[in-house]
């Protein structure tokens, strides 16, 4: 019923509408054009309307009859029929007449007034369509004389209007307007409260986008403010092929329609608050919301020719709507394309996101998908915004999880990044919708490695600057690489001391050990490369001195990469080093450092499986004869030996180190 009052306010060109009510009274006020005789007939006619203009909201009028139910308990029938209760209407075109009413001044009826008269109308509506004047004697249903609009009611009305309206007279324009005054029936305040909270408030706040002049709407102390939407308006001309095909009920004017969407601020803390508010509000409006058409939609749709059921709450599943809705969808698509063509990127992203974030239509309105939503969804699938423009195939679009700055073309030159990065938590709803509706997938470092052209990737790694390379390796190591275990071995990830990058497969091979029935992993015999590790980090320079090419990075610092490498045993590495030792190329200090490193008891750097016997096999030290002899084959200087054995003692320059001392046999 509240919408009936607001509808009248909009139709008569009001700039404001106030509704005041409490337990006993309801007062609806607007400052639009005063009623004329034609308008009065519209209110009094039963289940029809004299309104014919396409711009008049109430032209289809089930109308004002809903208001009458407010006068009594339940549907108000007993009060309407037995007690002859009804709403009182006052319509004026001079402010002095409003003031006279508020002050309870005497009034008198005037007969045979012309339609262009500026006299006010004051009447009580009995049985929904019988006008009773103040203090007018008429026949009741028993054909007895009675006064249905008493002086007491007139004074009561003026007093209550003065109480509620006086605070607004100075600041607002009331030089013309209409007032409806009702003594409320039992329980009606509670129903009005419920209707306001559940339907009216949100519906009107969106409807104000389509009601050009009506901007100041207040219910009791609550000011209703227009929820601003980006509105786009269109029309279907009379006599056009589309108009003829739609065949709207009223053919006196073009079909006017509009759609709206939230102007999303993607950088805000809660960018989709406006979208979520739209989604829990009615989707379709005929100036006011069709209350049962809440489609979980982020698109607002208004049309003056939409076909709705008699209760004004639901779309008709009929030929009018099945021809009309596709035309509105085409208009939305046209606007999307226009935004793209004129490079209005912001508007495109907002509308694209609004379409994408539309939820599932309730089952009882599922037919709307076929005639409206499906076309919108199909269009955005082939017009996906990307960081480089737009993509016509959503399967090539990826939601970026990749943090490092590496060209996506290395994976696939058709791939492109979705407009927004997945690491922005506030945009999660749009990523979820893109995955579900567009088939777009998140794309991280593991996905990239899986798809990457190995040669292109190797070339990029080779040419990357230090900061970019470090970022790439850090990100790669931060993920489990189980799904790319084989491929990761073929990528030249690590730079070595000769300035080149090598892959695991370049350096290490596998060999089946039949004796132990196992696969051994060994450094290739034709390679001089060694992966650096925590166990070799302290002897990097010595290894390079004896001819090894070692990785600049410590492999142990890349645990998720290393775990995918089948590394040779410490014993194999020790053997490889031992075989390459040339004591002539090492200084005395370097030789000592190698022996002490292998002989350490520090478990973090000690070679597993390498004990005293292995170290004694190293040929790094001279005896007193100046010959290089294995450590295990020299005598300690701590013993007194015959002169002929002194030649087999270690040189005195080695003897002083206690660690080395323990390696000699007595």
Question: What are the functions of these language-model segments?
Answer:
Residues 7, 30-33, 47, 66-68, ...:
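Short, flexible loop/turn elements at secondary-structure junctions
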Residues 10-14, 48-51, 72-75, 333-340:
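Hydrophobic/aromatic-lined pockets within catalytic cores
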Residues 26-28:
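Hydrophobic/aromatic residues in the conserved F-box-adjacent beta-strands of the Bergerat ATP-binding
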Residues 76-666:
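GHKL/Bergerat-fold ATPase module
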């Amino acid at each position: 019923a509240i919408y009936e009052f607001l509808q009248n306010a909009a139709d008569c060109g009001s700039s404001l509408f106030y509704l005041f009510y409490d337990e006993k009274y309801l007062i609806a006020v607007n400052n639009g054009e005063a009623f004329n005789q034609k308008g009065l007939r519209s209110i009094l006619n039963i289940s029809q309307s004299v309104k014919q203009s396409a711009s008049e909201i109430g032209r289809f009028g089930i109308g004002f009859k809903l208001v009458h139910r407010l006068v009594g308990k339940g549907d108000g029938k007993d009060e309407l029929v037995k007690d002859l209760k009804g709403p009182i209407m006052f319509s004026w075109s001079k402010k002095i007449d409003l003031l006279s009413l508020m002050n309870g001044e005497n009034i008198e009826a005037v007969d045979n007034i012309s339609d262009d008269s500026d006299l006010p109308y004051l009447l009580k509506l009995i049985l929904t369509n019988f006008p009773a004047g103040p203090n007018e004697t008429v026949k009741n249903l028993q054909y007895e004389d009675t006064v249905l609009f008493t002086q007491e009611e007139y004074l009561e009305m003026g007093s209550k209007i003065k109480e509620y309206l006086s605070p607004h007279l100075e600041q607002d324009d009331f030089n013309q307007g209409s007032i409806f005054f009702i003594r409320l029936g039992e329980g009606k305040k509670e129903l009005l409260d419920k209707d306001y909270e559940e339907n009216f408030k949100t519906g009107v706040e969106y409807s104000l986008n389509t009601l050009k002049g009506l901007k100041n709407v207040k219910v009791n102390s609550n000011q209703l403010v227009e929820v601003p939407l980006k509105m786009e308006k269109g029309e279907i001309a009379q006599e056009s092929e589309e108009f003829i095909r739609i065949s709207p009920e009223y053919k006196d004017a073009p079909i006017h329609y509009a759609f709206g969407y939230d102007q999303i601020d993607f950088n805000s803390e809660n960018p989709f608050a406006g979208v979520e508010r739209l989604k829990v509000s009615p989707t379709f409006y005929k100036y006011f919301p069709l209350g049962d058409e809440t489609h979980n939609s982020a698109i607002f749709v208004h049309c003056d020719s939409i076909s709705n059921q008699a209760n004004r709450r639901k779309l008709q599943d009929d030929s009018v709507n099945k021809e009309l809705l596709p035309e509105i969808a085409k208009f939305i698509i046209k606007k999307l394309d226009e935004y793209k063509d004129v490079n209005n990127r912001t508007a495109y992203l907002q509308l694209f996101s609004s379409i994408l974030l539309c939820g599932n239509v309730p089952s009882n309105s599922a037919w709307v998908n076929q005639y409206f939503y499906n076309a919108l969804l199909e269009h955005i699938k082939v017009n996906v915004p990307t960081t480089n423009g737009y993509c016509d195939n959503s399967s090539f679009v990826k939601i970026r999880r990749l943090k490092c700055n590496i060209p996506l073309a290395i994976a696939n030159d058709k791939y492109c990044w979705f407009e927004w990065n997945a690491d922005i938590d506030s945009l999660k709803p749009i990523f979820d919708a893109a995955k579900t509706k567009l088939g777009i997938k998140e794309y991280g470092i593991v996905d990239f490695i899986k798809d990457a052209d190995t040669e292109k990737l190797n070339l990029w790694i080779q040419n990357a600057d230090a900061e970019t390379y470090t970022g790439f390796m850090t990100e790669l190591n931060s993920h489990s690489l189980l799904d790319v275990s084989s491929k990761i071995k073929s990528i030249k990830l690590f730079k070595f001391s000769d300035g080149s990058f090598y892959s695991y497969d370049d350096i290490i091979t596998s060999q089946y050990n039949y004796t132990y029935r196992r696969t051994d992993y060994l450094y290739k015999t034709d390679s001089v490369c060694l992966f650096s590790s925590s166990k070799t980090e302290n002897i990097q320079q010595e290894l390079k001195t004896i001819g090894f090419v070692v990785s600049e990075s410590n492999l142990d610092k890349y645990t998720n990469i290393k775990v995918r490498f089948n590394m040779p045993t410490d014993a194999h590495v020790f053997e490889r080093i031992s075989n390459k030792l040339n004591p002539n190329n090492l200084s005395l200090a370097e030789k000592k450092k190698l022996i002490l490193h292998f002989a350490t008891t520090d478990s973090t750097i000690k070679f597993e499986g390498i004990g005293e016997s292995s170290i004694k096999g190293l040929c790094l030290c001279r005896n007193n004869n100046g010959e290089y002899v294995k450590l295990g084959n020299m005598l300690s200087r701590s013993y007194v030996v015959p002169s002929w054995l002194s030649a087999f003692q270690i040189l005195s320059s080695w003897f002083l180190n206690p660690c080395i001392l323990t390696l000699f046999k007595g």
